[in-house]
């Protein structure tokens, strides 16, 4: 799982140790494989392909004990966190669910996805599906802006493939400044 490179049909690479090392995975030739890939490792293909599409029919009887009720969208117009070109994230320094609205407002203003550190999720400032990092979502936006996120290694693992990282944190020694392309040591509320 979490494949970041395909060397050949039975040889893959995947990150381990919070993304600090890459392991070679070899499967026995001729075996059937099921694999998951790390979304952030590949760029989207685009719409200009010329692959042929073959239509096939399947003779499968519909189940008698299940039925389709309806299809609903997840709602909201904010881009999906894992496919957004820009992501605005907040950390524990926002100090409340009400203050976290600033993250949503800025994300909506620029058409970005909204994310959070594990500390912000654990504190109840935002829902779990916004968590970015090793135990959340691995993302690779062109622009990642972090407000009040210290930069624990687990969070950095989730953003290491971002194009440009901007960090705002009042602690000038916060680890996030080590990976940020642009850093501002300031209080978000001033």
Where in this protein do the model-derived segments appear?
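N-terminal glycine-rich FAD/FM-binding segment characteristic of electron-transfer flavoproteins
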Residues: 1-190
């Amino acid at each position: 799982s979490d494949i970041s490179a395909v060397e050949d049909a039975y040889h893959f690479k995947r990150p381990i140790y919070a993304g600090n090392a890459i392991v070679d995975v070899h499967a026995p030739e001729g075996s059937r494989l099921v694999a998951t890939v790390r979304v952030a490792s590949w760029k989207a293909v685009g719409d200009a392909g010329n692959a042929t599409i073959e239509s096939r029919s399947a003779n499968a009887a519909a189940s008698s004990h299940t039925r389709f009720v309806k299809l609903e969208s997840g709602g909201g117009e904010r881009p999906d966190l894992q496919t957004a070109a820009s992501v605005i994230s907040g950390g524990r320094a926002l100090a409340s669910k009400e203050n976290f609205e600033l993250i949503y407002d800025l994300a909506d203003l620029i058409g970005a996805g909204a994310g959070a550190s594990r500390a912000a999720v654990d504190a109840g400032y935002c829902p779990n599906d916004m968590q970015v990092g090793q135990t959340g979502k691995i993302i690779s936006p062109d622009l990642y802006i972090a407000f009040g996120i210290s930069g624990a290694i687990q969070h950095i693992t989730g953003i290491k493939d971002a194009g440009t990282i901007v960090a705002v944190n009042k602690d000038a020694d916060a680890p996030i400044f080590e990976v940020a392309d642009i850093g501002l040591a300031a209080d978000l509320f001033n």
